[in-house]
Each structure stands twice: as structure tokens, then as C-alpha cells.
Regions:
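Glycine-centered recognition micro-motifs in short, flexible terminal segments and loops
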Residues: 1-15
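Transmembrane signal-anchor/signal-peptide helices with a preference for the extracytoplasmic
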Residues: 17-43
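Membrane-proximal N-terminal amphipathic helix
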Residues: 36-69
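Long, compositionally biased low-complexity segments
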Residues: 121-418
Length: 418
């Protein structure tokens, strides 16, 4: 009997032990599940926050470009025959448009349902669909120059994201810094100083530091000429001929100019611009457009400068006005904006005088004035120079460049101006 009682006690003890282990295991499993759930919600919260910041940055960049369009429309369109008027404080005007969609308190139609405040509300609604309550307060919003082709928009935000299940919460105050490209937008300086008729789209020059190239140095004469070149000794009429030897070639003066290595036995007097260089055909193997400066003894490639000027591309400028300055109708970079960036914020383009002429509105084209935009539109009149080759372009031979702010060196035309 004692053995039976002892056996019963042992069985009860084993049963209780097993039961306890099962309870403990279930408790541990439940606790681990809870930990995993919390970890998942925290990770979801962090991912939500990162995605929210990305969305705020993207929306801020899109909205800023729309705000610039609204501001531009107010400085480019005249009313009742009056010339357009510049803005007073361009940075503050853009900040108002971005945040509230108004200009001096007046709603701008283009900003309807497109303000930063509106999109913040939309983002808050989207986070709720993912199980989070978010609250975003805009403390401040600033617009500054970043460099010559970008603006910097800084939105200081209070962000609170709360898990709707009460598991996790995040509270932060951050600055969303959005760098906004100006490319593809219109330059306000053009309409402001052409009674609203002129325009120019901002496109960064692809030729920075590579406007002209010196290809050959040699002996020559007979002034200079610009035109298409050729290595074809059978068809060089009205072209710049590049050849190794003049022997046997007739009608040399039918060419625009001649670049050759050896005169050979040809005794025909050359009346067109020419240059002699013993490696000419090697150094110029193809047939680009060339500026042959016979009297200067040099051959240049200047097509980059020509294309740049024809398209009125934009270049960084130490003294030219920034985009914000241009919205205010200024001809130089103001200290209030220059002090806000460590980069060059001024810009300049070459005015396409032919485009101004055909814009209409009886706008007077200043043929002898420099093509540098902020000087061209101003009352400043520094000495302006012609550039060899560009004075022979058809139909616009009126390209001029001043040497204010070192423009001759900047555009590599020091040996080409006169």
C-alpha cells in the first residue's frame, strides 16, 4: 500500500511538473510573440517615418516649382499696357506660395490643392490607412539660393507618429531640406525688360570651361574666316580646305580658306585666309566647322560657344543676379542672398538678339551691346567686343562680349576679340 501511495505522489509530481513546463512554455511563446509584434510595429513605424520624410521632400520639390511658375506669371504679364513689375522679396513670396498658395494674400489659381500645407494633410491621411496616426505641424518654411541652378527650401516640421494599437510612438522636430532644380523654368529677367515679350528657358550650359579650343598654330595670312571644313580636294568650293599638299590643285581661291602642310609646286597666289602647319591633317582628321585666323596664325574650334550663345544657356556668375534676384528685377547678386550660400548663386546667359527681335512688341535690339544678359538689359554699357567668326554668322552677326568680370578669359575668347 505504501508503494501505491508513493507511486501516486510521484505521478502527481510528474504531472504537475509537466503542466508547469507547458504553462511556462506557453507563457514564453506568448511573450515572444508579443515581443515580435512590438518589434514589427516599431520597424513599421521607423519605415513609415523614413517614407514620410521622402514623400515630404518630393512633394516640396514639386510644389516649389509650381510656386515659381505662379511667381513668374506675376512678373512676366503686364496689365492694361503697363510693363511687368518685379517682386519685392522673392524668397518670402515663394515661401508664401508654397505654404499657403497665396501671393500677397491673394489666392493663386495654379496653387489650388497644390500647397505644402495641403499635401501634408494628404500624407497624414495616407499614414492612417497603414495603421498610424500622424500629426505634422509646419513650424517655418524658408526659400534660399543653393547654387546658380538650384534653390534650397527648408521646412522645419514637428512630426508625431502614433501606432493606432498603442504599441509605439515617435516624436521629432526635423528640417526637410529640398534642393529644387531651376532647369526648364523661365528666366524672369527677360520679360521684365522686354515689356513681357522676351523669354528664355533656364538650361545649364553643357560647355562650362569648354567654349573654344585652339587646334593649330602655324604661319598664315589674309585675315580670318569661319566655315565648314573639308579634306576633299575635289570639292572644296566655299569651304575651308585641309590638305597635306597643294600640288596639282586648281581654283584654290574658290575655297573659303586653306590649311595645308606643304605648298609643293603650286605657285597660285593665295588670296583667301590660309595657315601652314606640318601636321595639320593629323591634328584635324575630321571636318568640323573651323575658325581659320590666318593673320593670327591659329585655327580654332568655336562651335561650342556658338551653340551656347544661340541657345542662351546658363553659366554660373560671380556678379550676375541669382534667380531670386531676377524675380526682383535686379542686375547683380544682392548680399542678402549671397550670404545664404557657400556656392556661386549668380547666373548669366547670352541674349539671343535675333530671338528678341522676333519676339515683337517693338522691343529695341541693342546690336552693339554685350550679349551678357544682366548687362544687356541694364543701363550699364561697358566696352563690348566682336568675336572673330561669330561676326560672320548668318542671320545674326551681332554677338558682342564685354570684359567686365573677366568674361574674355571665362569664355576663352581673349585671342579672338577685336
Amino acid at each position: 500500500m505504501r508503494k501505491g501511495v508513493m507511486f501516486s505522489f510521484i505521478m502527481i509530481f510528474i504531472t504537475l511538473s509537466v503542466f508547469s513546463l507547458i504553462v511556462i512554455q506557453n507563457s514564453l511563446i506568448s511573450h515572444r510573440r508579443e515581443e515580435i509584434f512590438i518589434e514589427m510595429r516599431v520597424n513599421s513605424l521607423e519605415n513609415m517615418y523614413e517614407g514620410l520624410i521622402d514623400d515630404l521632400d518630393k512633394s516640396l520639390r514639386i510644389i516649389t516649382r509650381r510656386a515659381i511658375l505662379a511667381a513668374f506669371s506675376n512678373v512676366s504679364v503686364s496689365e492694361a499696357g503697363e510693363p511687368p513689375e518685379p517682386l519685392d522679396e522673392a524668397n518670402e513670396t515663394l515661401a508664401e506660395l508654397i505654404r499657403y498658395g497665396t501671393l500677397d494674400g491673394t489666392p493663386e489659381p495654379i496653387m489650388e490643392n497644390a500647397t505644402f500645407t495641403y499635401w501634408v494633410g494628404k500624407i497624414e491621411d495616407l499614414t492612417l490607412l497603414k495603421g498610424f496616426d500622424s500629426y505634422i505641424d509646419i513650424n517655418s518654411l524658408e526659400v534660399k539660393p543653393y547654387d546658380y541652378i538650384h534653390l534650397l527650401v527648408i521646412a522645419r516640421l514637428n512630426i508625431s507618429i502614433i501606432d493606432t494599437q498603442g504599441v509605439a510612438e515617435l516624436n521629432r522636430t526635423i528640417d526637410v531640406n529640398s534642393i529644387v532644380s531651376l532647369e526648364g523654368l523661365e528666366d524672369p529677367l527677360y520679360p521684365l525688360y522686354t515689356s513681357g515679350f522676351g523669354d528664355n528657358m533656364i538650361r545649364a550650359s553643357p560647355y562650362l570651361g569648354n567654349y573654344t579650343q585652339l587646334l593649330l598654330i602655324g604661319n598664315g595670312d589674309n585675315s580670318y574666316v569661319y566655315g565648314e571644313s573639308t579634306h576633299d580636294t575635289g570639292d572644296f568650293s566655299d569651304k575651308i580646305l585641309i590638305t597635306s599638299d597643294l600640288t596639282g590643285l586648281g581654283a584654290l581661291n574658290d575655297a573659303k580658306g586653306i590649311i595645308f602642310e606643304l605648298e609643293g609646286t603650286n605657285l597660285t597666289p593665295i588670296n583667301v585666309p590660309y595657315l601652314i602647319n606640318l601636321t595639320a591633317t593629323t591634328l584635324i582628321p575630321n571636318s568640323p566647322n573651323l575658325l581659320l585666323d590666318g593673320s593670327g596664325g591659329k585655327v580654332w574650334f568655336i562651335d561650342n560657344l556658338i551653340i551656347d550663345s544661340e541657345n542662351s544657356y546658363y553659366h554660373p556668375s560671380e556678379n550676375g543676379p541669382s534667380y531670386l534676384d531676377r524675380l526682383e528685377g535686379k542686375f547683380t547678386t544682392q548680399n542678402k542672398y549671397k550670404s545664404q550660400s557657400d556656392y556661386t548663386i549668380g547666373m548669366e546667359s547670352f541674349v539671343n538678339k535675333l530671338a528678341i527681335y522676333f519676339a515683337g512688341g517693338n522691343v529695341t535690339v541693342q546690336e552693339e551691346k554685350t550679349n551678357i544678359d544682366y548687362i544687356y538689359f541694364s543701363t550699364d554699357s561697358p566696352v563690348s567686343y566682336k568675336v572673330k567668326g561669330m561676326d560672320q554668322l548668318d542671320p545674326d552677326p551681332y554677338f558682342r562680349i564685354d570684359n567686365q568680370d573677366g568674361h574674355h578669359v571665362k569664355y576663352n575668347v581673349s585671342n579672338l576679340v577685336y
